[in-house]
A protein has these predicted regions:
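A late C-terminal transmembrane helix in Major Facilitator Superfamily
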Residues: 375-405
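C-terminal ends and interior cores of transmembrane alpha-helices
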Residues: 102-120, 325-340
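C-terminal transmembrane helical hairpin of 12-TM major facilitator-type secondary transporters
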Residues: 317-363
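Glycine-rich segments within core transmembrane alpha-helices of 12-TM secondary carriers
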Residues: 161-185, 384-396
Length: 438
């Protein structure tokens, strides 16, 4: 009897650890696809879409139109969060995560074969917006499921570290998207890049999708979800998203405020600054493409390191530190841009897109999913996360470009915009209770 008990314990521990590892790797693989596709669109919108899909308007208005299509994807993310969250809470996380990767990859590949405005007229931007909406819908269901499955499967004292793979996918996705665009840009003329070169990274998405599907197929459904499904259920159940909104309305506002730092630092450095530095300052596009490579590579290291620190010293402390770094780096970043000082541009880009950004995203999975009950956690965390994407991130490049355009090229309003968002995130984290997010 005793020997049976002693042998079962280690076997259960090993099985749980293997489940946690497969969940972490599967979540990471899908996140790579989603971030690659989403960031690739932002990079290409800054370089190509204004000329390929909106050539009938001025360069400034073409840029605004291109960034507006970037924001369309974010408008559909909450809908994806609601639909995938509903079925994820009812049918399981794994099924939905397989579907989101398929949808994201196919939509991205199709963007790569859309004819230009000169070929099919206004149908070109219509198709672009439609596929961008599909991208947004798919990624809307991705984060909640990936974060939830990795958190629910992780060891109790290592939830930030094991779930950080969802955000490490951001670093790898940024590395791949900027790296491939930079490589093709360096090997083609401007005319070739605008004609067909930009399409290659979109078609490459299919390769990433196949790899992600293989890894996700090996994942197990989380034990916590299986236990919740076996528990007695009330005869009449409200929709999971309604349950989350009714029981935890304040959680949605917290998520929106907390994500401002992450979203503004990411999209101002990776999308807006790329356009601003080339169009307004005359800097070579390779500068911010290479910065994207550097930031993406560093994030693969910094995100898990910061997550380890969060598990050891407290999630809230790490979050506050990152948001304050973003607050203090906003003005110096734009001052470096104006001075065209390459060293300081790179330095403060790292402070914003690596230190500030990575310190806040590394703990979001356990922080946000912990705000909701298990039976409606996919819907609650997923919808809250995606609503925050619309409010705080979807139109960030558009807003920043509009601020510069209507201020005659002055950057101070964008710096204030960035600094304010980071400060709001810092204050929100400070006001949250330690027993929730210590």
């Amino acid at each position: 009897m005793d020997s049976t008990l002693t042998s079962t314990g280690p076997q259960q521990d090993t099985s749980s650890l293997n489940r946690a590892r497969r969940a972490a790797l599967g979540s990471f693989a899908g996140a790579v696809v989603d971030w690659y596709d989403f960031l690739l669109y932002g990079i290409t919108a800054a370089l190509v879409f204004n000329r390929e899909f909106f050539p009938q308007v001025s360069p400034a208005m073409g840029t605004l139109a291109a960034f507006a299509t970037f924001g369309v994807g974010f408008l559909f993310r909450p809908l994806g969060g609601i639909i995938f969250g509903h079925f994820g809470d009812r049918l399981g996380r794994k099924r939905m995560l397989m579907l989101t990767v398929w949808m994201m990859g196919i939509a991205t590949a199709l963007i790569g074969i859309i004819p230009s405005f000169d070929t099919i007229g206004w149908w070109a931007p219509v198709l672009l917006v439609t596929l961008r909406a599909v991208q947004g819908f798919a990624v809307g269901g991705e984060w909640g499921g990936a974060a939830l499955l990795s958190v629910e499967s992780a060891p109790k004292n290592k939830k930030a570290f094991y779930s950080s793979g969802v955000q490490v996918g951001y670093g790898v996705g940024l590395l791949l998207s900027t790296g491939l665009v930079s490589l093709i840009s360096s090997q083609t003329t401007d005319e070739q890049f605008l004609s067909w070169g930009w399409r290659i990274p979109f078609l490459f998405s299919i390769v990433l999708v196949l790899g992600a599907l293989w890894m996700r197929n090996r994942m197990d459904e989380s034990a916590e979800f299986e236990q919740q499904k076996q528990a007695p259920q009330p005869v009449k159940k409200r929709l999971p998203v309604i349950e989350a909104l009714t029981r935890h309305p304040g959680a949605f506002l917290k998520i929106i405020a907390l994500r401002l730092c992450e979203l503004l630092t990411m999209y101002i450095v990776t999308a807006f600054a790329l356009n601003y530095s080339t169009q307004n300052l005359g800097l070579p596009r390779e500068l911010f493409l290479n910065i994207g490579l550097l930031v993406g590579g560093l994030s693969c290291l910094t995100i898990p390191c910061f997550a380890w620190l969060a598990d050891r010293f407290g999630r809230r402390r790490v979050y506050i530190t990152g948001a304050l770094v973003g607050t203090l780096s906003a003005f110096p970043f734009f001052m470096a841009l104006e001075a065209q000082s390459i060293f300081w541009i790179v330095f403060f880009a790292i402070m914003l897109a690596n230190i500030a950004h990575d310190m806040v995203v590394c703990v979001q999975q356990p922080m946000f999913t912990g705000l909701f009950g298990a039976s409606y956690r996919y819907s609650g965390a997923g919808v809250g996360y995606q609503v925050a994407s619309v409010v705080g991130g979807g139109f960030t490049p558009f807003i920043a470009a509009a601020l510069v355009t209507f201020s005659g090229g002055d950057w101070h309003s964008v710096a204030i915009y960035l600094m304010t968002g980071c400060l709001i995130s810092a204050v929100t984290a400070m006001l949250m209770r330690d027993k929730q997010h210590a």
